[in-house]
Regions:
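N-terminal [4Fe-4S]-dependent radical SAM core
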Residues: 27-80
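Radical SAM/AdoMet-radical enzyme domain recognition
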Residues: 107-127, 135-219
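A short N-terminal interaction module
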Residues: 1-37
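Residues that cap or initiate secondary-structure elements
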Residues: 87-89, 100, 133, 159, ...
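Canonical Radical SAM [4Fe-4S] cluster-binding loop centered on the CxxxCxxC motif
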Residues: 72-74, 78-108
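Long, contiguous hydrophobic alpha-helical segments, chiefly transmembrane helices and signal peptides
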Residues: 49-53, 79-84, 93-95, 133, ...
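A broad, low-specificity signal for short, low-complexity segments enriched in glycine/proline
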Residues: 38-45, 53-55, 87-88, 113, ...
Length: 219
């Protein structure tokens, strides 16, 4: 059905590779997808499939290609923005720290970015900072208002708690990339004592609630 829907959006070789992967029970990507489905909250999994699989990958990409021809310019598949430059940590070598900690996008500004992005076919939004979760209330509002997009948050993990996880599960369209560097000693030398343990605690919480997350590693 994907080939019928997508047509010549991909090459015959691409479709053949996907078919081969689906038929191979030992394919690492199929194993990864199955593990995600097994360990993810059902509502979160459904929203990821709808927002990333259908809205972003299928419908969104077709809109993007059409709008590139209309406007004669490149349109990205995802948009990255910083809700705030504020942060509750002072990590050594942080590039964003050189810009100060007082810059903020208003809720209306962020709402406009997503609203106009969707009109062009963009349904995936990444947030960095600063620490985006300093603005967690506004992020939850955005996720609820735009429940057809996926929000991916790059975070130092320290502001993830039980109440926040419950809201993320209720909404279903927020995923996380947790910043961490190697061993506890290596990580805490750069980010401060106790940060590695805080990331492990956040991972345990996210896994407990079946929320999708990954890691962001500097090396």
């Amino acid at each position: 059905w994907a080939e019928q829907f997508w047509g010549n959006g991909f090459s015959k070789e691409d479709y053949d590779k996907v078919r081969a992967a689906i038929k191979d029970p030992d394919n690492r990507w199929i194993k990864f997808i199955n593990r995600v489905l097994d360990e993810t909250n059902p509502h979160v999994a459904k929203m990821a499939a709808l927002n990333l699989g259908f809205e972003a990958f299928f419908r969104g990409t077709k809109m993007i290609r059409k709008n590139r021809e209309i406007y004669h310019c490149n349109i990205p598949w995802l948009i990255l923005f910083d809700p705030t430059s504020a942060c509750n940590m002072h990590c050594q070598g942080c590039w964003s720290g050189t810009y100060g900690h007082k810059a903020n996008l208003s809720f209306d500004d962020m709402d406009k970015i997503i609203t106009e992005g969707k009109e062009l076919g963009v349904y995936l939004y990444m947030m960095t900072g600063g620490e985006p979760l300093v603005r967690k209330a506004d992020i939850l509002r955005l996720a609820e208002k735009h429940n057809d997009v996926e929000l991916s948050i790059y975070t130092n993990s320290t502001l993830i708690d039980e109440d926040f996880c419950k809201e993320v599960v209720r909404l279903g369209n927020i995923t996380f990339q947790l910043s961490i560097e190697g061993t506890p000693e290596t990580n805490d030398a750069r980010r401060g004592d106790g940060h590695y343990a805080a990331v492990m605690k956040a991972m345990d919480l996210l896994k407990k609630y079946g929320i999708i997350f990954g890691t962001s590693i500097c090396y």
